[in-house]
Amino acid sequence: MSVINCEEVKRDEFHTEKYYESYNIFGAHIVTEDEMRGVRFTVWAPHAKAMSVVGDFNEWDYEQHKMLQVTEEGIWSLFIPHIEEREIYKYAIETMAGDVIFKADPYAVYAEVRPNTASVVFDIKGYEWNDKNWSRKKKKKSVYKEAMTVYELHFGSWKKKEDGTLYSYREMAEELIPYVVEHQFTHIEIMPLVEHPYDRSWGYQGTGYYAATSRFGTPYDLMHFVDECHKYGIGVILDWVPGHFCKDAHGLYLFDGTPTYEYKDKDVQENPVWGTVNFDLGKREVRNFLISNALFWMRYFHIDGFRVDAVANMLYWNKEGQEQSNEHAVSFLRELNEAVFAEDEDFLMTAEDSTAWPLVTAPTYEGGLGFNYKWNMGWMNDVLKYMECAPEYRKYIHDKMTFSLLYAYSENFILPLSHDEVVHGKKSLLNKMPGDYWDKFAQLRLLYGYFFTHPGKKLLFMGGEFGQFDEWKDLEDLDWNLHDFEMHRYMHDYFKELIALYKRSKPLWQLDHSREGFQWIDANNNEQSIFSFIRQGDKQEDALVVVCNFTKATYENYKVGVPDFEYYNEILNSDAEQYGGSGQVNKKRLKTIQEPYHNQTAHVEITIPPFGVSILRPVKTRKGSKKQDGSKTKVRSNVTSRGKR
């Protein structure tokens, strides 16, 4: 049995320096050594007394294939000839206390289907990709100045087979991708696909960070799924959890009988609410494990982005009852983002962060954490609280709908209507809306209208597009039978039209991260709970006027100040009958009245629909947006541009 030498291990790099290809050393690799084909097993267990490899090939006898310690810092390795792909195995670890524990391989790229927990030998290097066109197109676009609509989903509960079993990665490619294309989503965001033992953890409590969960098939099957997404122009974002991991006996927890991947200090090690433990982000070997893992998913699975989970829990730790910043985590996140963007400058790194930590999406060289997007949790919480309030009382919390614009350009934001808000008794988005059946649908259409016209990229959890009535049930699939009901079909039609309008309307996304992209017309009409604003594109003539009415009242001849174009057309009204509304729409072309109003040089008079959003577009009567008197239209603005990145 041959042994890897210290040069192969790159000992100094793994233990003391940045080494982001640790998956090339550790794990189970099919190789030929001394003219014999077999598997090289390598693992880091710094406090193990002895190590061995066990599996069906030796009847799980830990006395047969003893590993050799090849570095003082605890790297163990062994080559076993004649072992083939798909062989299952674990590491048997004799602890310093004299106990023998059995662990899955932290670097395994494949694992048994739960409830079994062994690792599986698998050659991950053979998939032939067909997504060069996708890569070329992605590099031609600026992620910051493009439309972004993200469909968040849980792979196991989007849709199930008639017998209740799960679709495979390949079957989901056939089922999901046409649906996503039909709805014109630009990306899908999948809740964690790393190997995890408990279905109801939704993947957030992982045991195998390098192993795509075998619930849905092999690593090649997932590669095929991503390849097909790219073929149809869909980016793939994965939820990724570098902050904490589960305590299942076969996983990373107390890997060699002592805290190895987690902090030693119990005060900062444990997450009592989740029942997990925190990664020791101050330890070089752990950083190399995690950052190598991020690059592994990028290189082997061609992932387009990560949504980094629970960043707030990483940035702060509650030690001895006092909330303190975790400098290990701050340093780690900066190092992570630098490594990711060095690999792919067009990658999406999104922080799920509910804190007010500054400069989350600023580059590290400017003192930031280095992400390029952050979920706008403040917007989500304020807007949903406002929508859940009875309409007649909304005027008393008017500022919840305007406050977000005070900080909308402090970070690059994604507006999330995510899974977190439609589970654990929080109700579905539709059922959060107060009032009767009609009112609920009208207000959800209104919410979506405000969502798509507010600055920031968009994310919606599955089922929201057709008005899922029940909250998310993670052990079942979506209520697809709701399409049998008229109001849900109307909702679905409305959503598809709204997202199509968003994608073809540059003012709704081109300046998402610049103050020049948004201007209030009237932010202060709390008595009627009506908001009006302008969304602006790169060109002065690219402007849309948006009016939102958050009560059930209808208003005729309502004055709205507008940029001085000669005419406006209403291009979308959420109260249209084809969407299930009452039909209070503005069918005719709206002629501007040359009288200043709302700090604009002109105004129009429109019908304001109940619980409705109306989007107006200026009619460009001449090239260059000139009016009949020959002057050129300008949009009034008292703000300056501050783009990000």
From Swiss-Prot:
Keywords: Carbohydrate metabolism, Glycogen biosynthesis, Glycogen metabolism, Glycosyltransferase, Transferase. Pathway: Glycan biosynthesis; glycogen biosynthesis. The active site is at D309, E352. InterPro entries: A-amylase/branching_C (IPR006048), Branching_enzy (IPR037439), GlgB (IPR006407), GlgB_N_E_set_prok (IPR044143), Glyco_hydro_13_cat_dom (IPR006047), Glyco_hydro_13_N (IPR004193), Glyco_hydro_b (IPR013780), Glycoside_hydrolase_SF (IPR017853). CDD domains: AmyAc_Glg_BE, E_set_GBE_prok_N. One of its GO terms (molecular function) is hydrolase activity, hydrolyzing O-glycosyl compounds. Its EC number is 2.4.1.18. Residues 619-645 are annotated as: Disordered. Residues 636-645 have a biased composition (Polar residues). GO terms for cellular component: cytosol. Transmembrane segments: none annotated. It comes from the Bacteria. GO terms for biological process: glycogen biosynthetic process. It catalyses: Transfers a segment of a (1->4)-alpha-D-glucan chain to a primary hydroxy group in a similar glucan chain. SMART domains: Aamy. It is an enzyme of class 2 (transferase). Monomer. Belongs to the glycosyl hydrolase 13 family. GlgB subfamily. Catalyzes the formation of the alpha-1,6-glucosidic linkages in glycogen by scission of a 1,4-alpha-linked oligosaccharide from growing alpha-1,4-glucan chains and the subsequent attachment of the oligosaccharide to the alpha-1,6 position. NCBIfam families: branching_enzym, PRK05402.1, PRK12313.1. This is 1,4-alpha-glucan branching enzyme GlgB. It comes from Bacillus cereus (strain AH820). The lineage of its organism: Bacteria, Bacillati, Bacillota, Bacilli, Bacillales.
